[in-house]
């Protein structure tokens, strides 16, 4: 429709002197050549505009607008699918490059202001602990988590095995009635030596704590396996040019001592041009993401690999 509208827009206006004169004007060979040349130029312009519009459509088209709206893939044509895959594949690396530059500028600003915060570099998710008053579970405090869980389990076992039966006998709770109940059912008398309330409480608490501990430790270990092996999840490597200092010491000869064999050199400090004074450079394996795999061939992006 856009091509037809452009062709109609370059047609001559109606001749007020009659249709015969206008037909004779159009029938001349010069007019035909000029119109043919205009039509071909318009076709080329329209094709370029269509390609530009398709690129803009591929760049601005969003399949998933948000968590509430998901569009159907079946309605898309093959060319649309290819254009959207290409545009999104390019956007992945553009966003990674933007994140890398933003982090470098953030580190430079923190260095200029004297702010040193190493926790910002470790942005992997933390898991909240199920035990109250404990910090979120990470690989750093995993030993504290082990010690707390084992001490809690040991306390429950001691309470259920020693303290609770002693308190029941002193307070007169259970004991004889439970023994009579076992004897009336003609069950082994060894069962009367175990309090069912204490046994169920201790066994259930220990089982629940152990199961939750195993699940959360497995989550932390899975996150460790997903980290990049080179940068250990930080996304950065130490700059080899400045030895992670962010500055270079350059010595320049100034003058020679009388005799001509020795020269006096002065040193000056300047910011490292390789890392821009940050002391760290981008990890080429994870592209500053800290994850083990960050490319278009990631199984999370391409499910057919």
UniProtKB/Swiss-Prot annotation:
Transmembrane segments: 144-164, 197-217
Gene Ontology cellular-component annotations: chloroplast membrane; nucleus
Repeat positions for CXXCXXXG motif: 239-246, 283-290
Tissue: Expressed in young leaves, curds and flower buds.
Segments for region (CR-type-like): 206-297
Chief location bin: plastid
Other noteworthy facts: Its sequence is related to the DnaJ family but lacks the J domain. The CR-type-like region is similar to CR-type zinc-fingers.
Entry function: Involved in chromoplast differentiation. Is associated with a cellular process that triggers the differentiation of pro-plastids or other non-colored plastids into chromoplasts for carotenoid accumulation. Associated with carotenoid accumulation in de-etiolated cotyledons. Controls leaf petiole elongation by suppressing the expression of ERF1 genes.
Name of this protein: Protein ORANGE, chloroplastic
Organism this protein belongs to: Brassica oleracea var. botrytis
Lineage: Eukaryota, Viridiplantae, Streptophyta, Embryophyta, Tracheophyta
